[in-house]
């Protein structure tokens, strides 16, 4: 329920409003929040900004989360980010937000936020890191993989692996998939693009999500 092209502050408010708008019969329901890429700092910001939301959350699960930002944003513009709306399967759409996603993902911004804010201690945090072998990187992402590799070769084409980890979280998976393959099913709906530009997009996403939710559920239940 967030705008992929807006700031973490904007999207944190959207998350809060969505949860607040759930039917009254679900008011006591405990929540597990699952985020991908920029969705993770959106969730973390929501927990800090809205304590009433944090009280309802049992766990936050990060998949290739942009927790510490991305060095690629240092030379990026919001206009380039807006081009994500044309990527098949990305689900990035132009919304009526603040159009400030890129600034929210700059490493200095994210690191400053992490230094200035304490994550709620009642919530369990889990991180799944994407770290593909070179032959598992799609052609369209090769350049960003190499550019980011000048900072750290241990990256998923968009994020360095250490920037994907929520502080104090349990690292429960290191996945051999690039940043798109883990969550954006380009090849399923666009076979030509999937066979050429995004040619390493085959990943069993549904099975992965089922496994991670089962893991988190069992981990939580053991402590209750």
Model segments located where?
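Conserved alpha/beta-hydrolase
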Residues: 1-5, 61
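Phosphate/oxyanion-binding active-site loops and adjacent basic polyanion-contact surfaces
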Residues: 4-15, 39, 205
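Extracytoplasmic low-complexity repetitive segments enriched in small/polar residues
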Residues: 6, 31-33, 223-224
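Flexible, glycine-rich phosphate/dinucleotide-binding loops
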Residues: 6, 40, 69, 134, ...
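Helix N-terminus capping/helix-initiation residues
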Residues: 7, 42, 103-106, 160, ...
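Short, well-structured alpha-helical interface segments that form or flank functional binding sites
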Residues: 10, 29, 120
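Serine-dependent carboxylesterase/thioesterase catalytic core
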Residues: 13-115
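C-terminal catalytic-base region of ester-bond hydrolases, centering on the histidine
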Residues: 120-224
């Amino acid at each position: 329920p967030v705008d992929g092209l807006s700031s973490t502050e904007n999207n944190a408010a959207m998350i809060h409003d969505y949860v607040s708008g759930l039917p009254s019969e679900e008011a006591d329901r405990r929540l597990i929040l699952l985020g991908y890429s920029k969705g993770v700092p959106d969730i973390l910001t929501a927990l800090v900004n809205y304590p009433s939301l944090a009280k309802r959350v049992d766990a936050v699960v990060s998949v290739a989360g942009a927790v510490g930002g991305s060095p690629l944003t240092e030379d990026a513009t919001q206009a380039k980010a807006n081009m994500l709306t044309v990527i098949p399967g990305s689900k990035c759409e132009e919304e009526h937000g603040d159009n400030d996603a890129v600034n929210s993902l700059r490493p200095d911004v994210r690191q400053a936020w992490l230094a200035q804010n304490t994550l709620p201690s009642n919530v369990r945090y889990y991180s799944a890191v994407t770290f593909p072998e070179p032959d598992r990187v799609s052609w369209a992402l090769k350049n960003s993989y190499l550019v980011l590799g000048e900072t750290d070769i241990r990256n998923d084409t968009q994020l360095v692996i250490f920037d994907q980890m929520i502080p104090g979280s349990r690292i429960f998976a290191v996945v051999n998939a690039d940043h798109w393959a883990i969550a954006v099913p380009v090849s399923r709906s666009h076979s030509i693009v999937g066979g050429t530009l995004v040619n390493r997009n085959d990943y069993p996403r549904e099975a992965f999500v089922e496994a991670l939710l089962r893991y988190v559920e069992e981990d939580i239940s053991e402590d209750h």
